[in-house]
Amino acid sequence: MQGWGDRVSTGKRSIVRNERTGHIVGEDIEDATGLWGSFKGLMFRKSIPDGYGLVFRPARGIHTNFMRFPIDLIYFDKANRVTKVRPAMKPWRWDFTNAAGVIEMNPGSAARTDVQPGDLLRFEEEA
C-alpha cells in the first residue's frame, strides 16, 4: 500500500536503458520537478520498489538526510552520458557535483545493470 510519501507527482515517467549493455536500468524512472518534488525526493519513504528511480535535473548536490535506506546515485551529463556512479550512499551523507542530472535508485541497481562511467543512458518516455 502506498502512502503520502510514495510518489512525487510529476506526470513524466521514463524507462531508462543503458546503450552499451542494452540493460534496462529502471522501468519506472520519475522526474522530480517543481519545488516540492525536488525538495522531498526520496526522504521519509520506508522503501522503493526495484526498477523505480527518481531523476533530479540539474544535480549540483545530493543529500540523504531523513532517508531510511542507502541509495545508488547515477550522475550524467547533458548528453545523458554517465559521469559518476556512487553506490549505496548511506543516510545522512552529502555528495556534491555539477552534473546535468542524477538518478536515485535502490542500492545495487547500478551494479546489477552494469552502469559505468562513460555509458550512454537512453530515456524512453512512457505513454
PLM features: residue spans?
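Compact, glycine-rich, soluble single-domain proteins
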Residues: Q2-A127
